């Protein structure tokens, strides 16, 4: 009985075995070769742990994984199974039935940080003070996606300077030096309230405002004018960068396919009252605010069905 090595943990089906070690003349019990069987792998209690090639199939099952973690915790507390880093990217995709394009957003590649207990804590990026986080229930727990909206600091940027040391405490022998700042405070308090309002508030220029590193798009009313074939038509679905008249998706002329359009872009609103919904009796030109892409300029939109929802739909993954 002294030569029988007992495993300190409870035996699970398919895990562990009782072997006779150090006994001369006795052969080890024969077991089927693990390469020729499809059963779960058998881990033998030896000084060197044997890891079969089909161990990954057993780690997928949560129940068997818990058993395997119990085995490893008894053998070596520092030994644990680590999951691979998720390789994911955040992109913006333009879905269109008429124009087939895929545009990668300026967010660039991002990696999902896992909060599972088996994930390594060294690969996690520090969370920003101003970020967007969304929790998605996954197989191993909650996955949080964080985006740093502010620009990262430069690598060569020196650290902020330390504050100057405070002056030594003055003794009671210097009373006239203490009276001078008090007189200055009295003069500042005696100033009129108008002068106080006129003085601008101090602005800390050492902390620049954070700028987002991505751009949103919005549809604007566009004038398409071709200088080559003298064609002029209008369309409401011109995708511009939000807050500007800069066109994001450019396209060629529908007739000559030479010059880029649009020539000019403005918001979808009435030209008289500058409102999206108005009841002006006279308008500068015919604009149907409900369906602004149907215009009576060149006749290309007459008797044609256009679906506002299926032309463009832009998706942001944040």
UniProtKB/Swiss-Prot annotation:
Subcellular locations according to the entry: Cytoplasm, Cytoplasmic ribonucleoprotein granule
Region (Disordered): 149-211
A GO cellular-component term linked to this record: cytoplasmic ribonucleoprotein granule
Record's keyword terms, sorted: Cytoplasm, Developmental protein, Differentiation, Metal-binding, Oogenesis, RNA-binding, Zinc, Zinc-finger
Keyword flag Cytoplasm: yes
Ranges of Pro residues composition bias in the record: 155-169
Keyword hit for Ribonucleoprotein: no
InterPro entries in the record: Zar1 (IPR026775), ZAR1/RTP1-5-like_Znf-3CxxC (IPR027377)
Recorded superkingdom: Eukaryota
Gene Ontology biological process terms in this record: negative regulation of translation; oocyte maturation; translation
GO MF term set: mRNA 3'-UTR binding; zinc ion binding
Zinc-finger ranges (3CxxC-type): 219-304
SMART domains: zf-3CxxC (SM01328)
Pfam family name, one: Zn_ribbon_3CxxC
Domain notes from UniProt: Disordered region at the N-terminus undergoes liquid-liquid phase separation (LLPS) for the formation of membraneless compartments that store maternal mRNAs in oocytes. The 3CxxC-type mediates binding to the 3'-UTR of mRNAs.
Subunit structure: Interacts with YBX2.
Similarity section: Belongs to the ZAR1 family.
Described purpose of this protein according to its UniProt entry: mRNA-binding protein required for maternal mRNA storage, translation and degradation during oocyte maturation. Probably promotes formation of some phase-separated membraneless compartment that stores maternal mRNAs in oocytes: acts by undergoing liquid-liquid phase separation upon binding to maternal mRNAs. Binds to the 3'-UTR of maternal mRNAs, inhibiting their translation.
Protein name according to UniProt: ZAR1-like protein
Organism: Bos taurus (Bovine)
Lineage: Eukaryota, Metazoa, Chordata, Craniata, Vertebrata
Gene transcribed to yield this protein: ZAR1L
């Amino acid at each position: 009985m002294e030569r029988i090595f007992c495993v300190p943990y409870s035996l699970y089906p398919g895990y562990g075995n009782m072997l006779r070690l150090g006994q001369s003349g006795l052969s080890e019990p024969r077991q089927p070769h693990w390469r020729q069987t499809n059963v779960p792998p058998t881990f033998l209690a030896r000084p060197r742990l044997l890891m079969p090639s089909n161990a990954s199939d057993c780690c997928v099952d949560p129940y068997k994984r818990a058993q395997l973690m119990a085995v490893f915790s008894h053998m070596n507390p520092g030994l644990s199974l680590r999951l691979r880093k998720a390789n994911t990217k955040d992109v913006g995709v333009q879905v269109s039935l008429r124009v087939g394009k895929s545009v990668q957003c300026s967010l660039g590649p991002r990696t999902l940080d896992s909060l599972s207990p088996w994930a390594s804590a060294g690969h996690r990026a520090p969370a920003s003070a101003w970020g967007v986080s969304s929790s998605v229930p996954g197989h191993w727990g909650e996955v949080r996606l964080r985006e740093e909206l502010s620009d990262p600091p430069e690598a060569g940027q020196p650290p902020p300077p330390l504050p100057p040391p405070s002056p030594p405490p003055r003794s009671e022998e210097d009373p006239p030096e203490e009276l001078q700042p008090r007189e200055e405070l009295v003069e500042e308090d005696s100033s009129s309230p108008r002068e106080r309002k006129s003085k601008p508030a101090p602005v800390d220029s050492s902390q620049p405002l954070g700028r987002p590193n991505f751009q949103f798009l919005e549809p604007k009313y566009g004038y398409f004018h071709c200088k080559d074939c003298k064609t002029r038509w209008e369309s409401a679905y011109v995708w511009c960068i939000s807050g500007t008249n800069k066109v994001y998706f450019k396209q060629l002329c529908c007739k000559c396919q030479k010059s880029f359009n649009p020539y000019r872009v403005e918001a979808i609103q009435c030209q008289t009252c500058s409102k999206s919904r108005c009841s002006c009796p006279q308008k500068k030109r015919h604009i149907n605010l409900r369906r602004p892409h149907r215009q009576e300029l060149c006749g290309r939109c007459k008797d044609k069905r256009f679906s506002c929802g299926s032309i463009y739909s832009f998706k942001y993954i944040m």
